[in-house]
Amino acid sequence: MPDGVNGDRTRTYSWDDPLELLSRTAGMSGIEALRLIAAGELPPPPIGMTLGFGPIEVEEGWATFTVEPAEFHYNPIGVVHGGLALALLDSAMGCAVHSTLAAGVAYTTLEVKANFVRPLTSSTGPIRCTRTVVHGGRTVATAEGRVVDADGKLYAHGTSTVLIFGD
């Protein structure tokens, strides 16, 4: 992939081994693991490091993630790519469900839908995504989320359906 026409912008980041994180959280409930990640006592998953987001608050059935939109999130039309808000929604909604799961139980996204209300830019400032479990079944759960700025202005909202599996 080309470095760009001018090559005057760079971004370097690192991440921890995701299998090590999985090993360290084995035997923990979802909420225990998520609270340790939110507190900085466990490293965030690589997707959080790549996009620059992570959990800041977690309670049973809901989670709040934050990210500050930056130039490296931009698409070719000069705004933040919708994939950032979608990834934020997917992660937050999934973690809201994860916060309700016992040790040894996992989930995977079956479907995620997002509605983008207005564009994000690097001048938007930090955004938050707050998600809540709507239905927590034995094998399927649903959640909803909202992406807002510091003033509560809505940028995107969505829903997610996840498959629950494991012990």
Per-region residue spans from a language model:
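Terminal targeting signals and extreme-terminal segments of soluble enzymes
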Residues: M1-D167
